[in-house]
Amino acid sequence: MCNCKNKLNDFEKYVICEKGTERAFDNEYWNNKTPGIYFCKCCGVPLFSSEHKYDSGTGWPSFYMPVGEILEAPDLKGGMFRVEVMCANCKGHLGHLFGDGPAPTGLRYCINSVSLTFEPKY
């Protein structure tokens, strides 16, 4: 499933390939307010824009909509139902989707920073 294992360090492999989660408030982009685009760390496709990013108070980067194609799959780990989100291009794990986001979508894409790279908009 994980097509980019060779390019990743051990922690990136854990999150992206093994569907792990990084720590809240201890990740690169949770508080990033710089305008720009977030790309898939594995394959480089654009996934999210800072225009759709908001502070959800969770300690992870949160977006109310993607700009790229995202796959969704049920996630029943830990005895609870969640919706996993993955890059549609490479199938790398990004995070989870929740229904408690702001207007206009009511969605919260809760994303691991380690699954992304960021390019500022100048």
Language model: regions and residue ranges:
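A short Gly-Trp-Pro
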Residues: 1-122
